[in-house]
Amino acid sequence: MTMTIDTICKTLGLSHEGTVSVSRDELASLSLALVEQGASFMFMYATDDRARAGTFTVHAVFSVPRDGFFTLAAALPADRPSYPSLTRTIMAAHWYERLMFDQFGIVAEGHPDWRRLMHHENVPAGTHPLRKDFAWNTRLGEAQEPYPLHEVEGKGVYEIPVGPIHAGVIEPGHFRFSVRGERILSLEGKLFFTHKGVEKLVEGKSPAEALPFVERISGDMAVGHALAYAEAVERATATVTTPRARMLRVVWNELERLSAHVFDLGNMAGNGTGFSFMAAQGFRMLEDLRRLHEELVGHRYLHGAVTLGGAHDIDARGAERIRDVLAKTERELAEILDIAFSTDGLMERFETTGVLSEDAARAYGARGIAARASGLARDARADHPYAAYASLPFLPVVETSGDVAARFKVRARECAQAIELTRQALLALPSGGESVPLRASRGSALGWAESFRGTVIDFVRLDADGRIDRLAVSDPSFMNWPLFAEIGPGNIVPDFPLCNKSLGLSYSGTDL
């Protein structure tokens, strides 16, 4: 008999947003059962529970839109931490399982690709930094471990190595193209040159002490990360924020989205195709928004906009300034988008380039723009409303062609949506306080937010003193970088920068 999500939950005693313990041998089969009945794989993380239970634990998180999050947790023996791989049937798990081996030494048996992920060649074998007995300031020895890149052989096939250092002002990443003529046959990326050790560095810190680390996971996504983290900490401590704080969080989330999308629209059309008019106008409009951010919260990238238990307040003058800048941005954006959409040379570069099919987007667990431009209406604001989104009219923006043009259109439409949501939030802003103190307590919980790149999910566990025992972060870029294996091949080499900019991913957000 085919199991439904309801029957699975009933069988396991699993409640919404709950965690259920399963055996190591059940984890893969139950995970597949959830996916086959409509759940989406979202996140995997591990915890070192040797001190309390003598085990490591692997957690697999799933989402059912408008229903809840489900976590399956499998305890593994400390002397042999292994389990049957999920990747064999759920492709979206493949990077997480490689990452958990690098971090904890946990083996996903049967995984098809056992190369390193986070660790580069100079990290000695047996280095697992998220184990509790590994100190953050451990000095590593010298090593030169192999990291073989895939090779494509055939007549006329050659390789083009790009990076990790690039000509533009971007972060480091290496890409290896296998090419015949100008046509890309295969594309593989090697990232993780920007490792900061955030999840390790926050261990033992208070939630407030950890917040600045979280805000800096990805420089342009301070609100998205801070919001997911704050919601996790607040759930873990049973802290209930005020209605005003929840509505303020909508404002900050949408202002960050608007500024990022304005930048990406200019970057895609300008630096991606040479249509420099769009770059100049997009970057000029971005500067107006950055100056507004600094005027409102004292930081151009909105650090401090989200606080634990609340949000930075907005007075009447600040609200009026936001409305003025939104009106100007809306008017100017409409003008430049009209020019962009009526420029045949630009749209011809966008259309049919970098196509990601709906099936591939679903299989890889795509998030954000990448998912919605390929026909998947995935958006945490609608699927799992947080902050005050449940009280605002909202439907995800979806396109279906899956190409660069679709990703451009989704961003353009989401700019208009962000402007309208911000206006609605300011109009509905309740009176009252903007923050409450955290309740100091031991606990654990998930938190999430829909950043401009996609869904951020955090797991937070606090110890008996209310300090961070484990922070696990799922950044949307981590899920979306593997998409290049799908959108790169079949295109010509000069279109790769355009494909890259159309996804607009973060190197730093991927490499915590």
Descriptions of predicted regions:
Residues Y45-T47, G266-N271, L302-T307, E348-T352, ...:
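Short coil/turn segments at secondary-structure boundaries
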Residues P81, H94-D102, L227, E256, ...:
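Short alpha-helical basic/polar micro-motif
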Residues M278-G282, L292-V436, R442:
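Intrinsically disordered, low-complexity regulatory segments
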